[in-house]
């Protein structure tokens, strides 16, 4: 993600309120609280653990929770129940994207982005959170935002002020001076520094604690250089092993997981050795890094569709474009090797490098370019992603006691994952956000 354009800012409450009234009016129709019970009648229910379909099922929802799933013939509607008949559609758990930037958009004039305000980023977040939810993604990790804008966005979603997915958020990214997570566009006299720049053991410990103080659910660091940043090399390590060990130790002690942006093999290796919970991107991963990740149970979060979209449709400045071309030339083959070797994969998209709401296109890449089975691909966006987020008890599968997060599509995604690019029905925590149109 373009961390040159992440600036110190705070969420402007008025910016969120700009769109609250529009949302509130719609909520009276499709986002109203569920009745005492909601019966969701499905033609088929997909078990994402096994890939098996159960035909003619009814999901009984009470409040924000799944109460039961049973054959429709055995479930009788009671007075006061709301009944949602999805006909022959296939119902499955809401999807999860563990690498988003909801407060940003794919506008790649980095100098124009320097003029963006906290109010603009807040409005972006409100619009993009809704687009993501309506695309069938009911949970996300937001891994990078200026000034804790994502913290307040998360809180607004949780309070029901705006529609959006369940969120875990990182706030500002931690990185070295002059690195991918710093601000490198202006000369020294402008004193432009990234929110989370920290060098050395004591500084990184302070930054971890500060991010947590202001509401971060996880810590995001830059272990290597990046693509959408000026003056650095994606293959070059940035944080040292010792700095990352200090970050992970403090974060884990305080109950937070750590995600590491890492393209280069050395940075991937060190980050996994340090104990991070996920590697984001992993473009130049090699056998040594793969072995370390498997030993430690580190998740890999590929972000591959963005390369196709950017090269075909994007308008990157020259100092970004060549790096994107170089990375895309090797990333898919390296990620395919990691998948074949058994590295754990969770779906992440880097949404904001391409338009929000297209998140499900990542699954098509996994199946048709990386060689995953449809079931393995679906698991990256459900059970695996839930596990990485620490939410396996809450979401990732359709089971009694879990959040009533479910989506419906017209065909079986086990036969063609591309059907998930056109989700017809979305329920999150028992609230219907997208209804089937006749």
Q: How does the language model describe each region?
A:
Residues 86-161, 177-180, 184-187, 242, ...:
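Metal-associated gating/positioning segment near the N- to mid-region
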Residues 103-121, 177-193, 227-241, 296-328:
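Active-site gating loops and adjacent loop-to-helix segments of metal-dependent hydrolytic enzymes
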Residues 31-36, 45, 50-92:
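Histidine-rich, glycine-flanked metal-binding segment
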Residues 10-22:
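Bacterial N-terminal signal peptides
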Residues 253, 318, 327-413:
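His/Asp/Glu-enriched, well-ordered alpha-helical/loop segment
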Residues 155, 159-173, 235-260, 301-302:
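Alpha-helix-loop-beta-strand connector modules within alpha/beta enzyme cores
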Residues 124-150, 164-172, 216-229, 257, ...:
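Divalent metal-dependent hydrolysis catalytic cores, especially in the metallo-beta-lactamase
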Residues 107-110, 150, 229-231, 268-274, ...:
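Histidine/acidic-residue-rich catalytic or RNA/ligand-binding cores of hydrolases
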